[in-house]
Amino acid sequence: MKLCVIAGARSAFLTKSLVKSTRDIRVDHIVLLDNDQQKLKTYGEISRELSRRLDPDLTFEVTSDARAALTGVDYIITTIRAGGDAGRLFDEQTCLAHGVLGQETTGAGGFAMAIRSVPTLVYYCTLAREVANPGHLIFNFTNPSGIITQALRSKGFDNVYG
């Protein structure tokens, strides 16, 4: 089975955990999809090397091509940060300037993050609906995960869990 991590070139720790679990979850192909070319190059190569060392039989790819990454996929994990670190910083500083908590999972900061993230994730979910294997599952870890998961399910993506 094929697994794609959207915004996957940002955490070698996630890659390590996934690669170590591939036999248990019956995954033989992992794709890290990311639109940040620098992170894709740096962390993607670290992740590729981790994969090679931990499970040389695993097919492992890094790419910025969403269509290729999602074609034939069975599982998708989302971990995007729409707006990047600059967006998070802006949200948190704006909230603090107005005397409210600005962290990304609750409150005004989380709501701002959701507003930026939902359209991007709708795009990926729509593309996956077109090119992924029937019955594919999407596991949302994009914060604020509850708000985003509910928004995607409200848009008809009943295969999203988070």
Indicate residue ranges for each PLM-predicted region.
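Residues at the starts of beta-strands that form the adenosine-phosphate
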Residues: 2, 28-29, 59, 137, ...
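Short helix-capping segments at alpha-helix termini
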Residues: 23-25, 50-57, 131, 156
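Conserved acidic E/D residue at the C-terminus of a beta-strand in Rossmann-like folds
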Residues: 30-37
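N-terminal Rossmann-like dinucleotide-binding module
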Residues: 1-30
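Rossmann-fold NAD(P) dinucleotide-binding segment
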Residues: 68-134
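Conserved N-terminal Rossmann-fold NAD(P) cofactor-binding segment
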Residues: 37-72, 79, 86-88
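Rossmann-like dinucleotide-binding core of oxidoreductases
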Residues: 122-129, 134-162
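Gly/Ser/Thr-rich loops at beta-strand to alpha-helix junctions
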Residues: 7-13, 37-39, 140-148
